[in-house]
From Swiss-Prot:
Stated family: Belongs to the HisA/HisF family.
Major location (coarse): cytoplasm
Name of protein: 1-(5-phosphoribosyl)-5-[(5-phosphoribosylamino)methylideneamino] imidazole-4-carboxamide isomerase
Reactions accelerated catalytically: 1-(5-phospho-beta-D-ribosyl)-5-[(5-phospho-beta-D-ribosylamino)methylideneamino]imidazole-4-carboxamide = 5-[(5-phospho-1-deoxy-D-ribulos-1-ylimino)methylamino]-1-(5-phospho-beta-D-ribosyl)imidazole-4-carboxamide
Organism: Xylella fastidiosa (strain Temecula1 / ATCC 700964)
Keyword field contains Isomerase: yes
Pfam families noted in UniProt: His_biosynth
């Protein structure tokens, strides 16, 4: 399994922005140079990027298809992208526009049966399920939805296992407490997921700040890491991150069994 560094761009009203902990009222706007930034990703050695339509995530109706076509044609990058995916037709349109994978977030929690049908229809390499999670006072990883204002009945553990059983291959998980905070990823939750669903490739998202975080994700056996704010603010050089992500490990990641014991306190009861 090749470790993938995903430089990320979140787009709102045509501009590159970042939200702090997913809050639209706590937005930082950077610029509208989306295509030049994507080209810079490719020039730095990235082979993939992560593209989010924040307008669609809020209102529905993916709007970035023209931009997606420009990016893939101009840069050669493979793109996983989402935001506002509500139907099978949405998935098909985004794939037709050039996406390598479509990211499905809120709907993956609310309508799992539909998403599993799409997974089977389009194939496991074309879908990434994105689950945003927050740990409750009892240590259970919950799944906030509707802009993180409500909490789903299902737990992270339950959904991850059900999707794994249905053949899911790519799972992106964001610890809400770390999102946009530059405080480092919560590696406990990723080790937990890797032990729980070892056949699923786990992507780290939220809090990455430096090369050490990239290395930690790789050494934990994760499949990739999404880099957003740290790149936009110049705290992390993408070329260096890609180089560290591609370096062969001195040994295999820890077997899943060795990861289970330290994180068993996070299992739901």
């Amino acid at each position: 399994m090749n470790f993938i560094v995903y430089p990320a761009l979140d787009i709102r009203n045509g501009a590159v922005v970042r939200l702090q902990q997913g809050d639209y009222a706590r937005q930082t706007r950077y610029d509208d140079q989306v295509l030049p930034r994507a080209q810079a990703f490719a020039d730095s050695g990235a082979t993939w990027m992560h593209l989010v339509d924040l307008d669609a995530a809020k209102a529905g109706g993916y709007t970035l298809a023209p931009l997606l076509r420009q990016i893939t044609r101009a840069t050669g990058l493979q793109v996983q992208t989402g935001g506002g995916v509500r139907s099978r037709d949405d998935v098909a349109r985004i794939l037709d526009a050039g996406a390598a994978r479509v990211v499905i977030g809120s709907l993956a929690v609310r309508q799992m049966t539909c998403v599993i049908e799409w997974l089977q229809a389009f194939g496991p390499e074309r879908i990434t399920v994105a689950l945003d999670t927050r740990q409750d006072a009892g240590g259970v990883w919950r799944l906030p939805v509707h802009g993180w204002t409500e909490v789903a009945e299902a737990t992270l553990e339950a959904l991850a296992q059900q999707y794994a059983a249905a053949g899911l291959r790519h799972l992106l998980c964001t610890d809400i407490a770390r999102d946009g905070m530059l405080s480092g990823p919560n590696m406990d939750v990723y080790a937990y997921l890797r032990a729980l669903v070892p056949a699923v490739q786990i992507q780290v998202s939220g809090g990455a700040r430096d090369v050490a975080d990239v290395v930690a994700a790789k050494m934990a056996g994760c499949a990739g890491i999404v880099l957003g704010k740290a790149l936009l603010e110049g705290r992390l050089a993408l070329k260096e991150a890609v180089q560290h992500g591609s370096v062969a490990d001195p040994g295999d990641p820890l077997p899943c069994g060795e990861l289970t014991e330290p994180v068993c306190r996070y299992r739901s009861v």
